[in-house]
UniProtKB/Swiss-Prot annotation:
Coiled-coil stretches noted in the UniProt entry, renumbered to this chain: none
Chief subcellular location: nucleus
Cross-referenced HAMAP family: Clp1
Intrachain S-S bonds: none
The keyword Aminoacyl-tRNA synthetase belongs to this UniProt entry's keyword annotation: no
Location in the cell: Nucleus
Name under which the protein is recorded: Protein CLP1 homolog
GO molecular function, one term: ATP binding
SUPFAM superfamilies: P-loop containing nucleoside triphosphate hydrolases (SSF52540)
Described purpose of this protein according to its UniProt entry: Required for endonucleolytic cleavage during polyadenylation-dependent pre-mRNA 3'-end formation.
GO BP annotations, alphabetical order: mRNA 3'-end processing; tRNA splicing, via endonucleolytic cleavage and ligation
Sequence positions that bind ATP: E18, K59, D121, V122, G123, K124, S125, T126
Amino acid sequence: MSEELSHGKDYTLESDSELRFEIEQKDAKVLVTLISGFAELFGTELVKKKKYEFGVGAKVAIFTYQGCVLHVSGKMDVCYISKETPMVQYLNCHAALEQFRTDAEDKDQRGPVAMVVGPMDVGKSTLCRILLNYAVRVGRRPLYADLDVGQGAIAISGNVATILIERPASVEDGFPKTAPLVYHFGHKSPGGNSVLYNSVVSKMAEVTLQSLNSNKRTKSSGIIINTCGWVKGSGYAHLLHAAQAYGACAIFVLDQERLYNELLRDVPQGVNVVLLPKSGGVVERSKELRHESRDLRMKEYFYGNPRAPFYPFSFEVKFQDLRLYKIGAPPLPDSCMPIGMKAEDNKTKVVAVTPTPALIHHILALSFAESVEDDVIGSNVAGFCCVTEVDMERQAVMVLSPQPRPLPPNSLLLWSELQFMDNHT
């Protein structure tokens, strides 16, 4: 049952409790102001007397360690105060990581590499945000690696990405997405091409771990890694691969004892595996809601948000100027493969794509590789464009791009199964 607070209402929170609310109705808007005390949203401190605005899709949990009064106005689908919160346990995880960082700083060694794992909808990206915010609040500069190609916390879906965190996330907009290191995958689940997924994770891990040596503060701050919610079968194998590629020293398992025990059995002895409860405020999302969330991230990539709008460009590219490729060829039986090649080699083969009307709405990644002779899989991407029209008569496509025409010279575009319907008005 929805609750509308047109004139607003004050909520008094005791210590170690949180105010939770959800907004599902389009065009709904909720304003929150911290009147007194101290409060935080996923590790970011709220500023007293400042109004924070939340819109459709927001699932908010404002926590206080010491007690506070919050003023809330607007239309919410759910709003309540809860004393049942795992925030103190999450703070203990931060304290343990901070001990690792202090030791690493003293010895000029690499700081902790911590993975957050668990099934879908248990709050993995939220825990990552909390741990990163707590780290920067005590002067650290950790790296954030996002391996969740389904939702994409840093880049749009279908990619893995890493970003340096230098300041706490904005309460309303999260972490700034400036200068991310992004690798193209092109599918919304690792199962779309398991061999390719492991390859891009290994490459990003290699580059990320090397980059730690370039800055002493980042080196000791370490890495927080967000992962996919696929934790059975091949999904579990991907988690083990990522833990090995990054040399994880800690794995935080959210809300699944079976996964916790499997990891205890399978990871090296020196790795700390910790079972944590999920927050009671975590909401299970339907397939439709996950799809909407992906669409919203892509829309924000091209158009920004009401607080920081972007104005993308639309221009034509002739087929002859379109150097378009896809990673992964159709599977062939071993008997049809060239001598010495295995079927899985086809999974990382770079193949040319001929433009057809089927290309419409697809996302294309702009690779830093300049030719197929380069290491295309191991090259990061500069950005993305979307095919909005295919004209077979004129032999041209229209693309939506954050940058004006033309495409950079020698640009190599990589096909993605992800689609974006550009109906922005």
